[in-house]
Swiss-Prot record:
Gene3D superfamilies, per the entry: 2.80.10.50
Principal location class: other
CDD domains for this protein: beta-trefoil_STI_CPI-like (cd23372)
Species assigned in the record: Solanum tuberosum (Potato)
Coiled-coil annotated spans: none
Glycosylation sites: N1
Keywords of this entry: Aspartic protease inhibitor, Disulfide bond, Glycoprotein, Protease inhibitor, Serine protease inhibitor, Vacuole
The protein's name in its UniProt record: Aspartic protease inhibitor 3
Annotated GO CC locations: vacuole
Keyword Glycoprotein: yes
Places the protein is found: Vacuole
InterPro entries: Kunitz_inhibitor_STI-like_sf, Prot_inh_Kunz-lg
Length: 169
């Protein structure tokens, strides 16, 4: 299974790779936040792997995202992306780690073509359990960026989703 870096298409302060970092005020024993570096001239991002429900990775299908890094046993679950609970300050949900692979929960995402350039990430709760006849994307939310303690944190947004490309590592 290949690893990729998720790279923001923007340049300068609008650019920057996605990485695993420590969430402010978190008491988790491992890094547990999904962030984007503040500039495209910053360090390289943390590699990820995409784990599809089926055998291959395609656009617009449910998948899990996992930071693909060596880690101690205690921190393995802190590599799998999920959407956290509502953050009152930001009035949205922040992306964090601690998700589960293959479970019907808040750990499912999709990669879709951006309306501008590149791709967007969507958070998509596993909807077949919620609503058997609903269009699948009805429950999906766009992933963008909020500023948390000077860091760019990935979060669910209504506007300005993060436009990204994927670089195989």
């Amino acid at each position: 299974n290949s690893s990729y870096r998720i790279i923001s298409i923007g340049r300068g302060a609008l650019g920057g790779d996605v990485y695993l970092g420590k969430s402010p005020n978190s008491d988790a024993p491992c890094p547990d936040g999904v962030f984007r570096y503040n500039s495209d001239v910053g360090p390289s991002g943390t590699p990820v792997r995409f784990i599809p429900l089926s055998t291959n990775i395609f656009e617009d299908q449910l998948l899990n995202i996992q930071f693909n890094i060596p880690t101690v046993k205690l921190c393995v679950s802190y590599t799998i992306w999920k959407v956290g609970n509502l953050n009152a300050y930001f009035r949205t949900m922040l992306l964090e780690t601690g998700g589960t692979i293959g479970q019907a929960d808040n750990s499912y995402f999709k990669i879709v073509k951006s309306s501008k350039i590149g791709y967007n990430l969507l958070s998509c709760p596993f909807t077949s359990i919620i609503c058997l006849r609903c269009p699948e994307d009805q429950f999906c939310a766009k992933v963008g960026v909020v500023i948390q303690n000077g860091k760019r944190r990935l979060a669910l947004v209504n506007e300005n989703p993060l436009d990204v490309l994927f670089q195989e590592v």
